[in-house]
Amino acid sequence: MEYTSSPKPQLSSRANAFSIAALMSSGKTKDKESEENTIKPLEQFVEKSSCHPNLGDLPPLETHSDFSSGGGTGSGAPLCTEPLIPTTPGVPSEEMAKISCSLETKELWDKFHELGTEMIITKSGRRMFPTIRVSFSGVDPDAKYIVLMDIVPVDNKRYRYAYHRSSWLVAGKADPPLPARLYVHPDSPFTGEQLLKQMVSFEKVKLTNNELDQHGHIILNSMHKYQPRVHIIKKKDHTASLLNLKSEEFRTFVFTETVFTAVTAYQNQLITRLKIDSNPFAKGFRDSSRLTDIERESVESLIHKHSYARSPIRTYAGDEETLGEEGHSAHSRGSAFTASDNLSLSSWVTTTSGFSGFQHPQSLSAIGTSTASLASPLPHPIQGSLPPYSRLGMPLTPSALASSMQATGPTFPSFHMPRYHHYFQQGPYAAIQGLRHSSTVMTPFV
């Protein structure tokens, strides 16, 4: 008996849309679209000038009644900031149109811009380097001006640094917006005469990623690109303080070479090197190989003098003048635990540790003559017969001094010699601390 399959019932268009085949096919098309929208931008290179045209896409500047507050009502702008500078007609007044602004240290900014400037942001706030310094011209000498700065995002994208390509790539959309803030220069208001004579430096501006910051620092998102802007506002005489900016005249200046990426740690090693070489406050990060010959000699001489001054055994005051030439000075600055004739004190202690008294007058006289510069400034008739430890700065007891003057030859004070071997193993500082005591009973280190 043969079984025949019954014909499948025909489904309506609505029912067919919810079938397994239709759902799977629609899921594949959605996956393809999402891959095209998310994966491809990650592989696109970010051109150095690609961020500048987006500056024209900034929304119109919104008015803000409170000058000191950090934010305002949302304007629905796609960017992560809400500009706080009030809106005025596009064409500035004749007086404000005459004002021009130039960026100081432009050459340094250009060097960083070629590599892709990065600025560190921290919870406590970090200052910018290079610092934004500007100078104004065309201002009225008798008028008063307020200089401000804010930092706005370049676009609504988030970036990541590709180390294998040494370039920045788009990593997706920007993070949620942070409170926008204006930084008023602390010396404001300036007179026009002051602005003509001096430059305005925003060296105290600090960048932070702390959303709850209460110190007035500019809050930024990490791995986002930003553009600093400088604003100059003409202050009217009848206004005591800037509480309402609706009636104030202002002008904004943007320098494209100051665009930077906010980071919590430097991504590009070339940026790190350039900042170390250019920042005068980063001298601690430089090694001696980057110094000039003159600087290196001065640094080495300072280190040499410092180590010599800290030496526990050195010549007495006034004896340095009698040393004479460089050979004597170099010998006096040498290690106090190395004698002449290639005889080290450690080997000398080892060879004489088995005797209760010193029985080698020839070696002792050689040591005495070589270390004469390390003794007291006044010559002594029994200089060559004194025990070696007296010439190293150890005070002698009367009994030891008397025994050294006997015809039988010099002897050591009444302590056991092998114990001092432990002192010299501890280094010069620990050794002198043990030798400095005037007691004849010496105990070894535990």
From Swiss-Prot:
It holds the Pfam family T-box. The gene is tbx20. PANTHER family: T-BOX PROTEIN-RELATED, T-BOX TRANSCRIPTION FACTOR TBX20. GO terms for cellular component: chromatin; nucleus. The keyword Nucleotidyltransferase does not apply. Residues 108-287 bind DNA. This is T-box transcription factor TBX20. The keyword Coiled coil does not apply. It comes from the Eukaryota. GO terms for biological process: angiogenesis; blood vessel development; cardiac muscle cell proliferation; cell fate specification; cloaca development; embryonic heart tube development; embryonic hemopoiesis; heart development. Keywords: Developmental protein, DNA-binding, Nucleus, Transcription, Transcription regulation. InterPro entries: p53-like_TF_DNA-bd_sf, T-box_DNA-bd, T-box_sf, TF_T-box, TF_T-box_CS. Transcriptional regulator that may play a very early role in the differentiation of the cardiac precursors. The lineage of its organism: Eukaryota, Metazoa, Chordata, Craniata, Vertebrata. It is found in: Nucleus. GO terms for molecular function: DNA-binding transcription factor activity, RNA polymerase II-specific; RNA polymerase II cis-regulatory region sequence-specific DNA binding. SUPFAM superfamilies: p53-like transcription factors. Residues 50-80 are annotated as: Disordered.
